[in-house]
């Protein structure tokens, strides 16, 4: 049974790693086609770490969710080691996607404007990041809040940032990662049993 489990995990990891590489290649090629003069090889290399933030989050979350689902459906529970991963995964994933979204606000400083206008534009562009940070604070010890809040956040990102065929990449970069954060919170809420409090020794 353990050998089958390890083999399944290995195959799943390889498949998701291949999908990650193909997705990075597809994004790089699409950017090069749109503007071949701007997208030089060194700029493509710099874009890879940036694109890797949501994509590693995306495929990493899928890996954790599939492994958790398989263990839960087979054994009725998840192992203690996986339970720790599930507990921290949505919180760390939320921090990553908030950081990724906030990076786009740095474009404001390329504009020609007064310092006050730049600061105002920077804060305006960071409204989604600040909003998700507030949601994460409320959800940190309440997985059910995280599930509902990030599910709503994914829906809002889909409404405002996916409005046509040319904005479909935003599904992979924003909507799906945020949606998977919600699912990770759901698994933390529904599948992880709270640890019973330590029993007080009567002899103490």
Model-derived segments and their meaning:
Residues 5, 132-145:
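Juxtamembrane helix-break-helix junctions at the cytosolic face
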Residues 12-16, 23-27, 42-57, 120-133, ...:
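Alpha-helical transmembrane segments of polytopic membrane proteins
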Residues 80-113:
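Membrane-helix boundary elements
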Residues 26-38, 104-113, 159-165:
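Juxtamembrane "helix-exit" motif on the non-cytosolic side of transmembrane helices
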Residues 10-25, 90-100:
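Alpha-helical transmembrane segments
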Residues 1-8, 66-86, 193-204:
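Membrane-interfacial, low-structure loops and terminal tails that flank and connect transmembrane helices
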Residues 145-157:
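Central hydrophobic cores of alpha-helical transmembrane segments
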Residues 86-89, 167-204:
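Alpha-helical transmembrane segments and their immediate juxtamembrane flanks
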């Amino acid at each position: 049974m353990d050998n089958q489990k390890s083999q399944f995990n290995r195959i799943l990891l390889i498949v998701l790693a291949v999908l990650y590489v193909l997705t990075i290649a597809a994004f790089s090629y699409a950017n090069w086609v749109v503007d071949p003069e701007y997208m030089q090889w060194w700029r493509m290399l710099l874009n890879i770490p940036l694109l890797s933030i949501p994509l590693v989050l995306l495929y990493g979350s899928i890996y954790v969710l599939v492994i958790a689902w398989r263990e839960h459906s087979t054994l009725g529970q998840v192992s203690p080691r996986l339970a720790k991963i599930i507990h921290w995964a949505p919180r760390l994933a939320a921090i990553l996607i908030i950081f990724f979204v906030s990076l786009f606000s740095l474009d404001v400083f390329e504009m020609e404007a007064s310092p006050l206008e730049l600061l105002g534009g920077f804060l305006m562009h960071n409204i989604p990041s600040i909003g998700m940070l507030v949601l994460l604070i409320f959800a940190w010890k309440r997985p059910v809040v995280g599930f509902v809040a990030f599910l709503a956040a994914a829906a809002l990102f889909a409404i405002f940032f996916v409005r046509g065929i040319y904005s479909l990449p935003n599904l992979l970069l924003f909507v799906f990662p945020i949606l998977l954060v919600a699912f990770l919170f759901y698994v933390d809420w529904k599948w992880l049993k709270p640890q019973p409090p330590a029993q007080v020794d009567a002899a103490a």
